[in-house]
Amino acid sequence: MAQAPADPGREGHLEQRILQVLTEAGSPVKLAQLVKECQAPKRELNQVLYRMKKELKVSLTSPATWCLGGTDPEGEGPAELALSSPAERPQQHAATIPETPGPQFSQQREEDIYRFLKDNGPQRALVIAQALGMRTAKDVNRDLYRMKSRHLLDMDEQSKAWTIYRPEDSGRRAKSASIIYQHNPINMICQNGPNSWISIANSEAIQIGHGNIITRQTVSREDGSAGPRHLPSMAPGDSSTWGTLVDPWGPQDIHMEQSILRRVQLGHSNEMRLHGVPSEGPAHIPPGSPPVSATAAGPEASFEARIPSPGTHPEGEAAQRIHMKSCFLEDATIGNSNKMSISPGVAGPGGVAGSGEGEPGEDAGRRPADTQSRSHFPRDIGQPITPSHSKLTPKLETMTLGNRSHKAAEGSHYVDEASHEGSWWGGGI
């Protein structure tokens, strides 16, 4: 007779209870005691225990006696002991289970573990032990599982790496990055988790950051002329127009590789106006020294833009880091508080991507040699950049780096006045 599959939720609860009992005991526990403490049938408890044994979470020290930790090639856990006689058990137990440290010593070690993982990210138990001056993972296993039972740490089941526990990541372990395909005309992506990953490629009309505004106006009058081209008026602090961003603006890591991105704004508090088809004219590059650091060499480039949001950031000033490799970018701005207006027209100053007020630039008299490539760095960004390294990617068009100084917006707003393809990322990636 086929056995019904176990309930994953109950198994997870039972596993947490087992870890808690073993942690509080501080020494091997008999199966009968586990049955009593966990209030579960012996058969069900055995199934969970042997599954946890395969996952190196617990191990057998003697028949029907369990303790924390497991064995693997790196020695991440106490070795299984085959006790030949009861007389040998005390000595072997002493060799397997380290002496219980005092409360102050244990608390200090937990603080060291937490600080190490916070500074260095997910690590295996052996690396943590060596960083704290110990030799084997079993020296810290008891502390790690005790901290896990108190929801201070969490462990990835596949990599066996320990990390700081975050409630928003609960139940999402071992999942791959979010892949979003743009099937709809407009995609609104708001993902606030600290370890969230979003992958998007070959899209148009994109803003990545906080406090952004995007509009598109392609409504034509009966005589064929275009309607008014202006941003809608928005009163400061109007909760009906701004987004519902509540959490402080956090840092963003954006990776783009082999992507086609047109009409893109990277940064915060930017405004984009789309009037029909994008122009083919050169961009107006404003003078000045925008506070955006950049490094470029060949087909790969990285940028960092500081977030100008009001208020304080408990973990220091957050930044948006953009890494691009082998991308096609057209009509793009990188920085904060920029305005970009894209209008239909012939080659000339009709298309603007700049950090000014969105007005056309006076570059109609530019020499033909200047219009061959519409992408370059201002000469004073971060560190000197030679002309041979001035291209970010194989092809960039209408590229602007820089910030404006006006006060940053406090939310993100999207206005759609006609059907178009676009994506808006706000509230943190």
From Swiss-Prot:
Database matches in SUPFAM superfamilies: Winged helix' DNA-binding domain
GO MF, one annotated term: identical protein binding
* Residue spans crossing the bilayer: none
How this protein is processed and modified after translation, per its record? Answer: Phosphorylated.
- Please provide, in alphabetical order, the Gene Ontology terms of the cellular component aspect for this entry: cytoplasm; cytosol; nucleus
| Chief site of localization | cytoplasm
Span(s) of short sequence motif RIP homotypic interaction motif (RHIM) 2: 253-277
Residue ranges of every copy of the Z-binding domain listed in the record = 8-70, 103-166
Where is the sequence biased in composition, kind Basic and acidic residues? 407-420
- Annotated stretches, region: Disordered: 68-107, 277-299, 339-429
**Its job:** Key innate sensor that recognizes and binds Z-RNA structures, which are produced by a number of viruses, such as herpesvirus, orthomyxovirus or flavivirus, and triggers different forms of cell death. ZBP1 acts as an essential mediator of pyroptosis, necroptosis and apoptosis (PANoptosis), an integral part of host defense against pathogens, by activating RIPK3, caspase-8 (CASP8), and the NLRP3 inflammasome.
Describe the subunit structure.
Homodimer. Interacts (via RIP homotypic interaction motif) with RIPK3; leading to RIPK3 activation and necroptosis; interaction is enhanced by CASP6. Interacts (via RIP homotypic interaction motif) with RIPK1. Component of the AIM2 PANoptosome complex, a multiprotein complex that drives inflammatory cell death (PANoptosis).
Q: What is this protein called?
A: Z-DNA-binding protein 1
Species this chain originates from: Homo sapiens (Human)
